[in-house]
Regions:
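Alpha-helical transmembrane segments and membrane-interface helix-loop junctions
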Residues: 1-166
Length: 166
């Protein structure tokens, strides 16, 4: 169980850390876009679209890592006062009842969304926009998978924490 948890968490963290570099590219593209717009009055649908595509990929690919690092939004009013075992129970049931079903539905629907986009050859509706819209849409099932894998790691860690005698 420990090896599986470690494997899941290392995989999610590596992908999250790699995805975090997308923020640098987003900043560079936005700065270049603003410079071109205000200096030369040149705008591009493709540059605007790549900005939000990269942001979407960053958000989806790093969400599992954010959960691993406990950086997701949480209402800590009660949680912070709980014992380690009570926190483990909350994490276990929260992951089983809320997180994994959400990831499952997001994965299945996102996969169908991506497949349909690929099958119809979906491109940007904007002139000069990006082709192959299925590429960004594929980030949805991938992101849901990563978030779900981290959820499984949390479940395993919670079970271990519950079973350990204080």
């Amino acid at each position: 169980m420990e090896q599986l948890t470690t494997l899941l968490e290392k995989s999610v963290a590596q992908i999250g850390k790699l995805a975090s570099w997308l923020s640098l590219f987003i900043v560079i593209i936005i700065v270049a876009d603003v410079f071109m717009r205000y200096t030369f009055s040149i705008t591009s649908s493709a540059s605007f679209e790549i900005e939000w595509h990269l942001f979407g990929a960053l958000f989806l690919l790093a969400s599992g890592w954010a959960l691993q690092e406990d950086k997701h939004v949480r209402v800590d009013v009660f949680y912070q006062k709980f014992s380690t075992k009570t926190k483990a129970w909350v994490n276990l049931f929260g992951s089983l009842i809320l997180l994994l079903p959400f990831c499952y539905v997001g994965f299945i629907e996102g996969l169908q969304f991506t497949i349909t986009s690929y099958q119809i050859g979906e491109t940007s509706p904007d002139p000069g926009g990006l082709p192959a819209r299925f590429v960004i849409k594929s980030m949805i099932p991938i992101g849901m998978l990563l978030l779900g894998l981290q959820g499984i790691a949390i479940i395993l860690k919670s079970i271990k924490a519950i079973l350990v005698n204080d």
